[in-house]
C-alpha cells in the first residue's frame, strides 16, 4: 500500500517536473568554463544546495507561505550540466506560477551565483533574463577633464608666445628709434664739417679749423 | 631696410619638416590596403620603381624651385613667368581645401585619445538598451567598435541630405586641433623648426614599440604570411602575384600612392625649401626624404599586418568558441568536451548520431575561416579608427596601447598640417601688401580661424560624407594638373639649361643627365597617363556613389550623391584647376591694358 502511494507521489512529481512543463525552468551551468582547474563535480549534494538556494529566494518574497527544500523539484540532469526545476506549493499538487519564480530568482540572483562561485553567464536560467549591470555613471565624463587640461595648457602657451612676440617687437622698435636718432646726429655732424653753406641749422663753427684755413690761403 | 627672410636653424630641421609633412596618415592607412589588394609582397616592385622614376625627381624639382626662388609657391611661379602665377594660386587653393578637412582627422584623433583613459575602453562594450535587459540594437547588429565610431563619435545620419546638428563634442576637439596647429605655426620657422623634431621622430618611436608588441601578439605571423603570400598556398599566391603585376591598375595605384604620399603640388615643399640657404644640398635631401617616406610605408604595413593577423586570429577563435557553445548547449554535451581540435570530427559524429537534431541546428552553425577574416581589406578612417581600435581592445593593458596609438596618429596628422598651413601662409607673408599691414601672428590666426569655422561643417551629423567628398575629389585631379604644369613650365618655359646653371651656381653641384631625362620626358608622360586614367575612370563610372551607414542593419549601404553634392564636387575641382588658365588670362589682359595705356604717351 505504502509503495503504491510512493509510486503515485513520484509519478505526480514526474508530471510536475518535466522538460517544457508549465512553470518549469531550464538551468545550465558551465562550471569548467568558469573555474577551469578548480571546477567541482556536480553531484546530488550540489543539487541539494541548488534546491536550498531556490527555496531561499522564494522565502525572500514577502507575504508568501514559506517554501521548503522539498518543494523544489529537479529533473533531467544531463552531463552538460543542465536540468529542469519547478517549485511546488505546500500541497505538492500544483506548481507556483512562472512569473513569481522568475521575480524571486531575479531578486536573489547574485546570492545564487555566489553560492556556486559562478556568474550570470556561467549559471544560466533560460527564460529568466538577467539584469545587466548599469555602466558606472560619472558626473563629469573623464574625457572632458583631460580635454580641459590640454586646452588650458595650449591657451597658456599661445598667450605666452604672442605676448613675448609683442614685447620683443616693442623692444626692437625702441632700439631702432634710438639707432635712427644717433644716425641723424651723425649726418648732422658730417654736413657741418663739410661746410655746407646751405646748412643753416646753426651748428658750431670749428674755430681751430677756420683759423688754419685763413692762415694758409693768403700764401 | 628689408626684413631678412627667416631660415631654418640647421638643415636637419628642414629634413625633419619635410619628413613630418610627407610621412602622414596615408602611409599608415592607405599603403597596407594597396599592398593587400595588389598582391602583397609583389606590390613592392611597382612601388619602388615608381619611387625612383616619379617620386624622387618630382620631389627634387619642387625643393630646387623653392630653394632657388626663395619664395612661396605664388612668388616662385610668378618669377619663372608672370603667366604662371595661376599655378601658385591653384596650389594655395588646394592646400586651403586640404587643411579644411584634414584637421578633422586630428579632431577624431583627440576624441579617441581622450576616451582612452577609461576602463574598460568605451568601444569595447556595447551600451545597454533602455530596459537594461540586453544591449543596444544598433550595437548588436554592428560591432561595439563600429558603434562607437558611427554613433558615439560621428553620430552619423543615414544620408548626406540629412545634415543634422553640429556635434558639440567633436566641435570642441576641432577647436583644440586648430589651436594646437596655431601654436606650432605661430612664429613661423622659429616655432615650426622646433616642433618638427617631435612630429618627425615620435611616430617612429611608437611604431617601433608597436612592432615589438605586434610581432609578439598571438596570430601575428598569420597576418605577416598573408601580407607576403596572399591567397593561401604558395603556388596559388605566386600566380595571383604575377597576375597583379601584369594588371595596369597595380602600376597606376603604385604611381598615385607615391605621388600623393609625398605631398607634391601643394606648395608646402616649395614653402619649406624657400627657407633654406641657397647653398643647401637639396638633391641629397630629396633622395633621403623620399626613401624615408617609402621605408616608413613598408614599416607601417608590417605593423599593420601583424595587427590584422592578431585581430583575425582572435575573431576566428571567438567564432569557433561560439560554434562550440552552440553545439554543447543543443546536444547537452559535457562542458569542455568540444575543443577547437576535435570540432570537425565531433560535428560528423553528431550529424550521424542525431541527424534530425543536427539538421535543426545546422543553419546557425557559422563556417569559421581564418582566410575570410584576413581578407577584409580596409583603408582610410575605417582602418585607423575601427580595425585598429578593435585589435587594441583585445590586447592586455589596452589603455596604454590605445593612448600610444592615437598619440602617434596625432603626431602624424599635425606634422602634415604644418606643411599644409606653411603652403598657405608663406605666399601670404611673402606678399608685401598683406605683411605690411598685418603681423605674422595675426595672418596665421586668421587662416586658422577661417579654416576652423568652415571645418564645423565636418562635425555635423552628415559631416563624414562631406569629408569623403573632400578626401576623394578636392586634391586628386587638380594636383596632377598642377605638377604637370610645374614640370613643363620649369623645363620648357624657364629652360632646363638655365635652371641647371642656376643650381650649379647655388649648390655647386652639377645636374646629372638622369634628372634631366626624368624632368623633361619621363615624369610628364607619367603624369599625363595618370591624369588620363583618372578622367576616364570618373567618366566611365557614371553617377558617383557613396557609402552611407544604415543604423538598422548595422552596415554600410551604397547611395547616389544628390545633385547639389555633385555640384560641390565639380566646384572643388574647377576652382583649383581653373586658377591656372584664369591666372594666365588675367596677366595677359592686364599687360594688354598697360600697353594700351602707355601707347598714346610714346
Language-model region placement:
Chain B
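Hydrophobic, membrane-embedded alpha-helices of multi-pass small-molecule transporters
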Residues: 16-26, 98, 103, 140, ...
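Membrane-interface "cap" regions at the ends of multi-pass membrane proteins
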Residues: 1-29, 58-63, 73, 86, ...
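Membrane-embedded translocation segments of transport machinery
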Residues: 1-10, 193-419, 425-456, 460-461, ...
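Flexible loop linkers connecting adjacent transmembrane helices
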Residues: 30-44, 58-89, 109-127, 220-229, ...
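Transmembrane helix-boundary motif of multi-pass solute transporters/channels
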Residues: 13-49, 60, 180, 185-186, ...
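Membrane-interface loop-to-helix entry segments
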Residues: 107, 111-114, 125, 172, ...
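Hydrophobic alpha-helical segments and their helix-loop junctions in multi-pass secondary transporters
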Residues: 58, 102-107, 111-120, 137-140, ...
Amino acid at each position: 500500500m505504502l509503495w503504491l502511494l510512493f509510486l503515485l507521489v513520484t509519478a505526480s512529481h514526474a508530471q510536475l517536473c518535466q522538460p517544457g512543463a508549465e512553470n518549469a525552468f531550464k538551468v545550465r551551468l558551465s562550471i569548467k568554463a568558469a573555474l577551469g582547474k578548480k571546477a567541482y563535480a556536480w553531484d546530488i549534494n550540489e543539487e541539494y544546495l541548488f534546491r536550498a538556494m531556490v527555496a531561499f529566494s522564494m522565502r525572500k518574497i514577502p507575504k508568501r507561505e514559506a517554501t521548503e527544500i522539498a518543494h523544489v523539484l529537479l529533473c533531467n540532469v544531463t552531463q552538460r550540466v543542465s536540468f529542469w526545476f519547478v517549485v511546488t506549493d505546500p500541497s505538492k499538487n500544483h506548481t507556483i506560477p512562472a512569473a513569481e519564480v522568475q521575480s524571486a530568482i531575479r531578486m536573489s540572483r547574485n546570492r545564487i551565483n555566489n553560492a556556486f562561485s559562478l556568474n550570470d553567464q556561467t549559471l544560466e536560467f533560460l527564460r529568466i533574463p538577467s539584469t545587466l549591470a548599469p555602466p558606472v555613471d560619472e558626473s563629469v565624463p573623464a574625457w572632458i577633464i583631460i580635454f580641459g587640461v590640454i586646452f588650458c595648457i595650449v591657451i597658456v602657451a599661445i598667450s605666452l608666445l604672442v605676448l613675448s612676440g609683442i614685447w620683443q617687437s616693442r623692444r626692437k622698435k625702441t632700439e631702432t628709434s634710438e639707432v635712427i636718432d644717433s644716425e641723424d646726429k651723425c649726418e648732422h655732424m658730417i654736413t657741418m664739417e663739410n661746410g655746407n653753406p646751405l646748412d643753416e641749422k646753426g651748428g658750431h663753427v670749428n674755430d681751430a679749423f677756420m683759423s688754419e684755413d685763413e692762415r694758409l690761403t693768403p700764401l | 631696410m628689408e626684413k631678412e627672410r627667416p631660415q631654418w636653424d640647421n638643415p636637419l630641421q628642414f629634413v625633419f619638416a619635410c619628413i613630418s609633412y610627407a610621412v602622414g596618415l596615408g602611409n599608415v592607412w592607405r599603403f597596407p590596403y594597396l599592398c593587400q589588394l595588389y598582391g602583397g609582397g609583389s606590390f613592392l616592385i611597382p612601388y619602388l620603381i615608381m619611387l625612383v622614376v616619379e617620386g624622387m625627381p618630382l620631389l627634387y624639382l619642387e625643393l630646387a624651385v623653392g630653394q632657388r626662388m626663395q619664395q612661396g609657391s605664388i612668388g616662385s611661379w610668378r618669377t619663372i613667368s608672370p603667366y604662371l602665377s595661376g599655378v601658385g594660386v591653384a596650389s594655395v587653393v588646394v592646400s586651403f581645401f586640404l587643411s579644411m578637412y584634414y584637421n578633422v582627422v586630428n579632431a577624431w584623433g583627440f576624441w579617441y585619445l581622450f576616451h582612452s583613459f577609461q576602463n574598460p575602453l568605451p568601444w569595447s562594450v556595447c551600451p545597454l538598451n533602455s530596459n537594461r535587459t540586453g544591449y543596444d540594437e544598433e550595437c548588436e547588429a554592428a560591432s561595439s567598435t563600429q558603434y562607437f565610431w558611427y554613433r558615439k563619435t560621428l553620430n552619423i545620419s543615414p544620408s548626406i541630405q540629412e545634415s543634422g546638428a553640429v556635434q558639440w563634442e567633436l566641435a570642441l576637439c576641432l577647436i583644440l586641433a586648430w589651436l594646437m596647429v596655431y601654436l606650432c605655426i605661430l612664429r613661423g620657422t622659429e616655432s615650426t623648426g622646433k616642433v618638427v623634431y617631435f612630429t618627425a621622430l615620435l611616430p617612429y618611436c611608437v611604431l617601433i614599440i608597436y612592432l615589438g608588441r605586434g610581432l609578439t601578439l598571438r596570430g601575428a605571423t598569420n597576418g605577416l604570411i598573408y601580407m607576403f603570400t596572399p591567397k593561401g598556398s604558395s603556388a596559388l599566391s605566386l600566380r595571383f602575384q604575377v597576375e597583379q603585376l601584369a594588371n595596369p591598375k597595380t602600376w597606376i595605384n603604385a604611381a598615385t600612392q607615391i605621388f600623393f604620399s609625398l605631398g607634391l603640388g601643394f606648395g608646402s615643399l616649395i614653402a619649406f625649401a624657400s627657407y633654406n640657404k641657397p647653398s643647401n644640398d637639396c638633391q641629397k635631401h630629396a633622395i633621403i626624404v623620399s626613401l624615408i617616406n617609402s621605408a616608413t610605408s613598408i614599416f607601417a604595413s608590417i605593423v599593420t599586418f601583424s595587427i590584422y593577423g592578431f585581430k583575425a586570429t582572435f575573431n576566428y577563435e571567438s567564432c569557433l568558441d561560439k560554434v562550440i557553445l552552440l553545439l554543447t548547449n543543443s546536444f547537452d554535451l559535457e562542458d569542455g568536451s568540444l575543443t577547437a581540435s576535435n570540432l570537425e570530427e565531433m560535428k560528423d559524429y553528431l550529424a550521424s548520431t542525431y541527424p534530425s537534431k543536427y539538421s535543426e541546428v545546422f543553419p546557425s552553425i557559422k563556417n569559421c575561416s581564418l582566410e575570410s577574416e584576413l581578407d577584409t581589406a580596409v583603408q582610410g578612417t575605417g582602418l585607423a579608427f575601427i580595425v585598429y581600435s578593435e585589435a587594441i581592445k583585445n590586447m592586455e593593458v589596452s589603455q596604454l596601447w590605445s593612448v600610444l596609438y592615437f598619440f602617434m596618429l596625432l603626431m602624424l596628422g599635425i606634422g602634415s598640417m604644418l606643411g599644409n598651413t606653411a603652403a598657405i601662409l608663406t605666399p601670404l607673408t611673402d606678399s608685401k601688401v598683406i605683411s605690411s599691414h598685418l603681423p605674422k601672428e595675426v595672418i596665421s590666426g586668421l587662416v586658422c580661424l577661417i579654416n576652423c569655422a568652415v571645418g564645423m561643417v565636418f562635425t555635423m551629423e552628415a559631416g563624414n560624407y562631406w569629408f569623403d567628398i573632400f578626401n576623394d575629389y578636392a586634391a586628386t585631379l587638380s594636383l596632377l594638373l598642377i605638377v604637370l604644369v610645374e614640370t613643363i613650365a620649369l623645363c620648357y618655359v624657364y629652360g632646363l639649361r638655365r635652371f641647371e646653371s642656376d643650381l650649379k651656381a647655388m649648390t655647386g653641384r652639377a645636374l646629372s643627365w638622369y634628372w634631366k631625362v626624368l624632368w623633361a620626358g619621363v615624369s610628364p608622360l607619367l603624369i599625363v597617363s595618370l591624369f588620363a586614367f583618372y578622367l576616364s575612370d570618373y567618366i566611365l563610372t557614371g553617377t558617383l556613389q557613396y557609402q552611407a551607414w544604415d543604423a538598422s542593419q548595422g552596415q554600410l549601404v551604397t547611395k547616389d550623391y544628390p545633385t547639389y553634392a555633385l555640384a560641390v564636387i565639380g566646384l572643388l575641382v574647377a576652382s583649383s584647376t581653373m586658377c591656372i588658365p584664369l591666372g594666365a588670362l588675367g596677366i595677359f589682359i592686364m599687360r594688354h591694358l598697360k600697353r594700351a595705356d602707355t601707347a598714346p604717351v610714346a
